[in-house]
Swiss-Prot record:
Belongs to the RNA polymerase beta chain family. This is DNA-directed RNA polymerase subunit beta. Its EC number is 2.7.7.6. CDD domains: RNA_pol_B_RPB2. HAMAP family: RNApol_bact_RpoB. Gene3D superfamilies: 2.40.50.100, 2.40.50.150, 3.90.1100.10, 6.10.140.1670, DNA-directed RNA polymerase, subunit 2, domain 6 (2.40.270.10), RNA polymerase alpha subunit dimerisation domain (3.90.1800.10), RNA polymerase Rpb2, domain 2 (3.90.1110.10). It catalyses: RNA(n) + a ribonucleoside 5'-triphosphate = RNA(n+1) + diphosphate. It comes from the Bacteria. The lineage of its organism: Bacteria, Pseudomonadati, Pseudomonadota, Gammaproteobacteria, Lysobacterales.
């Protein structure tokens, strides 16, 4: 049984889930918040910081040594300062929210003359390294005043990967295998086979070289290479004839010998027969050590070593030569006793490296290095040093090459090593063994005999030989998540490396000129790199702020695109497809439709990343068929070894699996296993899906395509005026609302002492007060009518009343689209599935007028309009109400400064901010000259460039902000705004101080009442303080009391100190705020003044608006019908929405039907509760009825509601909140069954079929058959007809073609395109067509003439030459073809 919090007791969802919750839904923004916290390590003691984030980046670049080595700059530590502006101020002023980064560095200068590098002097100093953006507590960044989200990236993990070309390269369809070593940063190293089975290597995808060149450059000789990759057969040469083979029976398998193979007289294999496994067993049993074979058995085999005549030193044959008859005789003649040959065959021991050596032109290490140099730097003359340095820098220096911890772990696992740690560079025993520097010696000592490059080639040749498998690059064990912190670290490191180059050059000057660290380091490159990343990286996105769900989903998004990722064009089908390893890690449903499908995914509900960045998902442990509550997180790699049962596998009361065979997953396959073989079990049925998909009730009854649309469209729902909780939900709504950050949650428990629309004050309970200075008062300021990124309205409303007792985490105020702390994206509408006069053809939606009347889908949109006054060449622009040629009426909404009043209702075309721009002297017409002579100069030297309301928009002005550049006098309106803002802040601080003070005095009263005094404040020694005495005493005189009790004296002293401390603190904060408000603003260059006007636009639902349910059932409103014409039930209740029943069967989203049935039951139960309340039934009866609703089903122990926890008062409050309908939760994949839905309908006294008789509102006649009726949570999406409808009469024209511009934003026209022209041609409408192509488009003279004609009342047109024809002529002339028009 759960105990309920204050908020949860207000309204409880009936939960149909059968599984009890093992794991609470985790904090949904953890992937963002934790990642960035690890990057900053802000509140970590500098000595204890781990190798992550800023600390790691600074450590990797420093120390920086000068070229001579006589000066070095070392890193000591860093700290982050306080941000100058808080989040709200940054949003308002268009600033970035960040803190200054100060790094402590130490400059060490060594004595040149000394041989032991003695230190000459040391200087330590703090250096400013730019601003580091800070993350808000909701996981966003504020960049230039807008909220942005850095989306996590799913990229290929560093490490080594083996693959083949799927037979596409060569016409024969032969599989060509390849390997690729991918570092975290540095050059890629590829190995690949060609069709002739030679092995090649490529560096950074350049020209390929035989792999032996790379090995030779590492220092291996031919003999060493062959010894590494082949086993060797030894032949002893008889002096006269024949050869003895040292026999390893296994190596003969599959061969056909040209002679009998015998053990003494017993023939084991006859000549010409193939040797099988049985023969080999007989050979092993016989114990034959050597086998006499004829000469032709050894001829044609490949030598493993050079063969030298011992007496003369003459080279008889080289390693990798095929032995010829002549050479064999030469060996005999020179008395060579034994030779080694490579054991190769065509089956599973291919001669790949041997083939490669034959095409390798190089002989020495230097030649190989030069060859690599030529390939990397074609056209540059190679020198020995240059070639060696280039090769070393490619893979063997940490500055240029970094496998990273992940890469090393993946590399070692793939080549079959035990340890998961190692060097970040590639290690090779031969290469480092031949070098003498300290670092090389350290590496050799640490890693001894291993070799990374050789190991990769060995695994690759094994795969080519048929042993081993290639990797699946779409497996989530080979793709990892790069989150904000890691990306920021990489960008920061890039900036530091740029700084490093500059510092190196200046350090040589520092030796001689005594520069300080501050003069050495220029922070600009670091700041620029960070600014560029947060401002314009592909993964830094404008936050989707339509509603709380869209915010949460955006932060949990995982993208395969972006820098270092895929591109849409190159991504094939495999990458986009659902992979078995997505289960529980990435949502298999939610992904965009369109070109990004499958490339952008959402994290599953319980998924998290591990230390390496791989996604993990939780499972419950199962031992011998018993399921435990212990939870373990497994990554895709670890999961491969286990058998995993589903969350809804049947268990008995003791949590033992009861089925004989349990449905399981194992290595990506679904199969049945006995309980004893099961290792783990899912924690929850919704483990596979993301937050958005987990919000769709009855998801298990919807087709996946429609579920995808449903999940995506919930993110587009616009918050309505009054949010309404979904009657049928899934139980996860509360978690989404809580973590989205739109609600206000209590930081600490306590009592509500003061409340208004904009502020809630909580007196904290004693247990949660920390430290002596803590006054025990929490003040929550609410967000009122603010604009979101998508222009929707963000507003918070208090939910609590004075005197309420709350606990930590309780919801104090609702935000947009939340209802008592639950996500509420739409409205519960009464829906009927039936055709109605063709108005719901093709998914159209028929609405009742009542929906519009009751403002059910009325939404508020806040538009921000900006007017900027610049300094122009002809003089400054001016914001004023004195505008030429504008009527008084047009100016009646402006104040004397030329800015619109707050509260003014404006329509399209109205002036909001008056602005005039100086215009150049032009040639005056005689009329203008006359006017000038009469009225003086002023009238014409400025033109009107006021800010007007854009077409198609009307609303109410709710806020105006005026920004003035520093050093320019503020106008009256700006000063007014400033004064009112200072007043507001002052009042805020005064209120806060008063509340704190009252709380302190109250606490003090409880500590001194009833205590004895020694005197003071008019009391005698031995008097006892009473409540009445304190009430009559002035507050300031309390501190004059001298107490007998030591503790009471301390309490008085402490209270006095607290009040003084708070007073000082508030004064400081107020002065700080005041300074910020009165200071001039930092505006863009050339801008003198900027006015922002915020318009609240009310949008009622109307035909053309898009609406949708949660099951992908979307449509467009076709008509709004009077209430009296809508179908109605026998009770006289009319339906709100009529949907087309034909939209259901073909789309296979049956979830909507079940939702409608259950929603009807929920509403019916609410009505029954309301009837009981109105009849003033006994509380006991009410309790029994509620118990019947929540706890009827005895089998469902998991989700019983313990009503005994509720007092009668709480029960009545609960019942009042249920009268609008009893909310139900039907969790994904664990939802209500048909029987349960029927039971709920019966309990609500509704037909269990879910259908009822409807009557036609126009005629009153009953319809022929019963209709499915019920309540569905229906959303209005942010695709409103008001934003899309657009018409143009005259407007702007394109400069070159003189044709009207296109698009609503440019106030453009509709293109009369190619096909439309064909249509007019087909009808022979020649004059209409001529008009379309000339005067209505780009015949400049023609359209001017036509305007004059219309003004003069003549209705005729003269079509001239379209401007685009002139453009065409000019184009042709630019190709040097003259084309002239003749008058005809």
């Amino acid at each position: 049984m759960t105990s309920y919090s204050f908020t949860e007791k207000k309204r409880i969802r009936k939960d149909f889930g059968k599984q009890r919750s093992i794991l609470e839904v985790p904090f949904l923004l953890a992937i963002q918040v934790d990642s960035y916290r690890e990057f900053l390590q802000e509140n970590v003691d500098p000595a204890k910081r781990t190798d992550h984030g800023l600390h790691a980046a600074l450590k990797s670049v420093f120390p920086i040594a000068s070229y001579s080595g006589n000066a070095a700059l070392e890193y000591v530590g860093y700290k982050l300062g306080e941000p100058v502006f808080d989040e709200r101020e940054c949003r308002q002023r268009g600033m970035s929210y960040g803190a200054p980064l100060r790094v402590t560095v130490r400059l060490v200068i060594y004595d040149r003359e000394s041989s032991t590098k003695a230190i000459k002097y040391v200087k330590e100093q703090e250096v400013y390294l730019g601003e580091i953006p800070l993350m808000t507590e909701n996981g966003t960044f504020i960049v230039n005043g807008t909220e942005r989200v850095i989306v996590s990236q799913l990229h290929r993990s560093p490490g080594v990967f083996f693959d083949h070309d799927r037979g596409k390269t060569h016409s024969s369809g032969k599989l060509l295998y390849s390997a690729r070593i991918i570092p975290y940063r540095g050059s890629w190293l590829d190995f690949e086979f060609d069709p002739k089975d030679a092995l090649f290597t490529r560096i950074d995808r350049r020209r390929k070289l035989p792999v032996s060149i790379l090995l030779r450059a590492l220092g291996y000789s031919n003999e060493e290479m062959l010894a590494e990759f082949f086993e060797i057969n030894t032949f002893h040469i008889n002096p006269d004839e024949g050869v003895q083979l040292e026999l390893v029976p296994e190596r003969l398998r599959g061969e056909t010998l040209g002679f009998d193979l015998a053990d003494g007289d017993k023939v084991i294999v006859e000549a010409g027969k193939r040797i099988t496994a049985r023969h080999i067993k007989q050979l092993e049993a016989s114990g034959i050590a050597a086998l006499a074979v004829p000469d032709d058995y050894i001829v044609g085999r490949i030598l493993s070593h050079d063969v030298v005549d011992a007496s003369t030193g003459e080279l008889l044959a080289q390693a990798n030569d095929e032995i010829t008859d002549e050479q064999l005789q030469a060996f005999r003649k020179a008395g060579v006793d034994a030779v080694g040959t490579l054991w190769v065959n065509d089956l599973d021991r291919g001669p790949y490296l041997s083939n490669t050596l034959r095409i390798d032109p190089t002989k020495t290490q230097l030649e190989a290095l030069v060859e690599i140099y030529r390939m990397m730097r074609p056209g540059e003359p190679p020198t020995k040093d240059a070639a060696q340095n280039l090769f070393h820098n490619l893979f063997f220096t940490f500055e240029r090459y970094d496998l990273s911890a992940v890469g090393r772990m993946k590399f070692n696992r793939r080549v079959g090593r035990k340890e998961t740690t190692g060097e970040a560079v590639l290690y090779d025993r031969k290469y480092y063994g031949e070098r003498n520097d300290e670092e090389s010696k350290r590496l050799v000592a640490a890693h001894g005999d291993s070799s990374d490059i050789l190991d990769v080639i060995k695994v690759l040749t094994e795969i080519r030989n048929g042993r081993g498998v290639v990797d699946d690059i779409d497996h989530l064990g080979n793709r990892r998540v790069r989150s904000v912190g890691e990306m920021a670290e990489n960008v920061f490191r890039v900036g530091l490396v740029r700084v490093e180059r500059a510092v190196k050059e200046r350090l040589s000057m520092a030796e001689s000129e005594g520069l300080t660290p501050q003069e050495l380091i220029n922070a600009k490159p670091v700041a620029a790199a960070i600014k560029e990343f947060f401002g314009s990286s592909q993964l830094s996105q404008f936050m989707d702020q339509n509603n709380p769900l869209s915010e949460v989903t955006h932060k949990r998004r995982v993208s395969a695109l972006g820098p270092g990722g895929l591109t849409r064009e190159r991504a094939g089908f495999e990458v986009r497809d659902v992979h078995p390893t997505h289960y529980g890690r990435v949502c298999t449903i939610e992904t965009p439709e369109g070109p990004n499908i499958g490339l952008i995914n959402s994290l599953a509900v319980y998924a998290r990343t591990n230390q390496y960045g791989f996604l993990e998902t939780p499972y419950r442990k199962v031992v011998d068929g018993k399921v435990y509550d212990e939870v373990e997180f497994l990554s895709a790699i670890e999961e491969n070894e286990y058998v995993i049962a589903q969350a809804n596998a049947l268990t008995n009361a003791d949590s033992v699996l009861t089925e004989q065979f349990v449905p399981c997953r194992f290595q990506g396959e679904s199969l049945l296993k006995p309980p004893a073989e099961v290792h783990f079990m899912d924690v929850s049925p919704m483990q596979t899906v993301s937050i958005a998909a987990a919000l769709v009730p009855f998801l298990e009854h919807d087709d996946a395509n429609r579920a995808l649309m449903g999940a995506n469209m919930q993110r587009q729902a616009v918050p309505t005026l009054r949010a309404q909780k979904p009657l049928v939900g899934t139980g996860i709504e509360r978690a989404v609302a809580r973590d989205s950050g739109v609600t206000v949650n209590a930081r600490r428990g306590g009592e509500i002492v003061q409340i208004d629309a904009a502020r809630i004050v909580v007196k904290v309970v004693e247990e949660e007060i920390v430290g002596a200075t803590d006054a025990g008062v929490d003040i929550y300021n609410l967000v009122k009518y603010t604009r979101s990124n998508q222009n929707t309205c963000i507003n918070q409303r208090p939910l609590v009343q004075v005197g309420d007792i709350i606990a930590r985490g309780d919801v104090l105020a609702d935000g947009p689209s939340t209802d008592i702390g639950e996500l509420a994206l739409g409205q519960n509408m009464l829906i009927a599935f039936m055709p109605w006069n063709g108005y719901n053809f093709e998914d159209s939606i028929l609405l009742s007028e009542r929906v519009v009347e009751e403002d059910r889908y009325t939404t508020i949109h806040i538009e921000e309009l900006t007017c900027v006054a610049r300094d122009t060449k002809l003089g400054p622009e001016e914001i004023s109400a004195d505008i030429p040629n504008v009527s008084e009426q047009a100016l009646n909404r402006l104040d004397e400064s030329g800015v619109v009043y707050i509260g003014a209702e404006v329509r399209a075309g109205d002036i909001m901010v008056g602005k005039v721009t100086p215009k150049g002297e032009s040639q005056l017409t005689p009329e203008e000259k006359l006017l000038r002579a009469i009225f003086g100069e002023k009238a014409s030297d400025v033109k009107d460039s006021s800010l007007r309301v854009p077409p198609g928009m009307d609303g109410t002005v709710i806020d105006v902000q005026v920004f003035t550049r520093d050093g320019i006098e503020k106008d009256k309106r700006a000063r007014q705004i400033e004064e009112s803002e200072i007043k507001r802040v002052k009042k805020d601080f005064d209120d806060q101080f008063r509340i704190l003070e009252a709380a302190i005095y109250m606490r003090l009263r409880s500590q001194i009442v009833g205590k004895v005094v020694n005197g003071g404040a008019g009391l005698k020694k031995g008097d006892v303080i009473s409540d009445a005495f304190l009430d009559g005493l002035k507050k300031a005189d309390w501190f004059a009391l001298r107490m007998k009790d030591e503790d009471a004296s301390e309490a008085i002293e402490r209270a006095q100190k607290q009040i003084q401390a708070h007073e000082k603190e508030f004064e400081r904060r107020f002065a700080d705020k005041r300074g910020k408000i009165t200071a001039g603003d930092d505006l863009a260059p050339g801008v003198l003044k900027m006015v922002k006007v915020f318009l609240a636009v009310k949008r009622r639902i109307q035909p053309g608006d898009k609406m949708a349910g949660r099951h992908g059932n979307k449509g467009v409103v076709s008509n709004v019908v009077p209430v009296e014409d809508m179908p109605y039930m026998a009770s006289g209740e009319t339906v709100d929405i009529v949907l087309n029943p034909l939209g259901v069967p073909s789309r296979m989203n049956i979830g909507q039907i079940l939702e409608v049935h259950l929603g009807w039951a929920a509403k019916g139960l609410g009505r029954k509760i309301q009837a009981m309340m109105e009849a003033q039934a006994a509380v006991a009866d009410l309790r029994k009825f509620l118990d019947d609703i929540y706890n009827h089903d005895d089998t469902n122990v998991a989700n019983r509601v313990d009503l005994s926890q509720f007092s009668d008062e709480e029960l009545l409050r609960l019942a009042r909140n249920l009268t609008d309908g009893v909310p139900m939760a039907t969790p994904v994949f664990d939802g209500a069954t048909e029987a349960e839905i029927k039971r709920m309908l019966e309990l609500a006294d509704l037909p269990s079929s879910g259908q009822t008789q409807l009557y036609d509102g126009r005629t009153g006649e009953a319809f022929d058959r019963h209709t499915t009726v019920g309540y569905m949570h229906y959303l209005k999406l942010n695709h409103l007809v008001d934003d899309k409808m657009h018409a143009r009469s005259t407007g702007p024209y394109s400069l070159v073609t003189q044709q009207p511009l296109g698009g609503k934003a440019q106030f453009g026209g509709q293109r009369f395109g190619e096909m439309e022209v064909w249509a007019l041609e087909a009808y022979g409408a020649a004059y209409t067509l001529q008009e379309m192509l000339t005067v209505k488009s780009d015949d400049v003279q023609g359209r001017n003439q036509m305007y004059k004609n219309i003004v003069d009342g003549e209705h005729e047109m003269v079509a001239g030459m379209p401007e685009s024809f002139n453009v065409l002529v000019k184009e042709i002339r630019s190709l040097a073809i003259n084309m002239e028009l003749e008058d005809n």
